A protein has these predicted regions:
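C-terminal and inter-domain tail/linker signature
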Residues: 1-163
Length: 163
């Protein structure tokens, strides 16, 4: 049963099918943000706008790993958000009914994570009726994204092995 649920989760993301995704989640499922432990989305009413925003921004989704058992599955994929490549791991904790009860998301590399924040944050805030927060988030993430991209390109390689 868990493999079917993980397959629905995967297929929903690949095809951007929000209804299919919601069918894989328990009605009171929780999604934990990859950005902070202070934000989570609970239940279909909160998951729907999150999924709509995610599916509107993620491109070239390619799953490469699906492993686990009847209680927990881990699916990992690569995608693009804006000009950044990301790799996301989703830890899917399944309920006794085989539906997703909880998802914890992990995203790498840092420029991709910040690009995700830059794209998703304002859109999610807007869909939640928080227009001022949406404007603030749209402005606040830009310098962070520029700094992270610059550091990733110029500073981080200085710590790596000489080649």
């Amino acid at each position: 049963m868990s493999i079917d649920t993980a397959e629905r989760y995967r297929r929903a993301l690949e095809t951007r099918d929000v209804e299919l995704a919601l069918s894989a989640f328990a009605p009171d499922a929780v999604v934990r943000s990859p950005l902070t432990s202070r934000v989570r989305f609970t239940g279909h009413a909160e998951l729907r706008p999150l999924l709509e925003v995610a599916y509107s921004h993620l491109r070239d989704v390619r799953f490469h790993t699906d492993t686990g058992d009847e209680a927990t599955r881990v699916v990992v994929y690569t995608a693009r958000i804006g000009g950044e490549e990301i790799e996301e791991a989703a830890v899917l904790k399944l309920g006794e009914d085989g539906l997703i009860a909880e998802v914890t998301l992990f995203v790498r590399p840092l420029p991709g994570l910040v690009a995700l924040m830059d794209a998703f944050g304002p859109d999610i805030a807007r869909r939640n009726g928080r227009t001022f927060a949406a404007r603030l988030l749209a402005v606040a993430a830009k310098p962070l994204l520029a700094m992270v991209r610059s550091g990733d390109k110029r500073a981080v390689p200085l710590a790596g092995p000489r080649r």
